[in-house]
Curated annotation (Swiss-Prot):
One of its GO terms (biological process) is regulation of translation. This is Large ribosomal subunit protein uL1. It comes from Shewanella oneidensis (strain ATCC 700550 / JCM 31522 / CIP 106686 / LMG 19005 / NCIMB 14063 / MR-1). Belongs to the universal ribosomal protein uL1 family. It comes from the Bacteria. GO terms for molecular function: rRNA binding; structural constituent of ribosome; tRNA binding. GO terms for cellular component: cytosolic large ribosomal subunit. PROSITE patterns: RIBOSOMAL_L1. Keywords: Repressor, Ribonucleoprotein, Ribosomal protein, RNA-binding, rRNA-binding, Translation regulation, tRNA-binding. Part of the 50S ribosomal subunit.
Amino acid sequence: MAKLTKRMRVIREKVDGTKLYEINDAVALLKELATAKFVESVDVAVNLGIDPRKSDQNVRGATVLPHGTGRDVRVAVFTQGANAEAAKAAGAELVGMDDLAEKIKAGEMNFDVVIASPDAMRVVGMLGQILGPRGLMPNPKTGTVTPNVAEAVKNAKAGQVRYRNDKNGIIHTTIGKVDFTPVQLKENLEALISALKKAKPAVAKGVYVKKVSISTTMGAGVAVDQASLETAN
């Protein structure tokens, strides 16, 4: 506990919770404070001006970050025929239909993303209680239910992030690793914010992107001055 206490004391001394940091300063601060013995992820929380209680104001989707996430993503694909061969060629680790469903029912969950062609949803639908709670259920809004499974596999491998607001209207996702360059993290964040703005519900009123904070896995949040991002306008 002593190490954690010391770490948190340093964070409190370094991070001004009332300040908006220019993006490069924010990234530099995260890198300075990232002292864990592993390469920490850089996470982002975006507070949106939506009413999450209303279904027509919920924001959900996916976007490919220009510099990826720094993670090796394992992909499972439910499809058959020519699509199965295309999915394998695109790099999917697991491809199948009922046989893949049986593996998952037996507890084989060695994957990070599940993709399905529309004709496979009859099989995937029976796995809702297993995949749903883990956030793995394929959905057309995130591009994981698609006739072009090969492209979806390539996107997942290239660093696609899926996003969905929580009950407080906040989007939580990752934009890379702490060993990314400042430019890579900035451009990944800008790509995410741009995607969120394109996904703005038509009925949302007032300021849409209210607050943007970045943090490392073990660190505190640092509020980013949106004027320092290319998506400011």
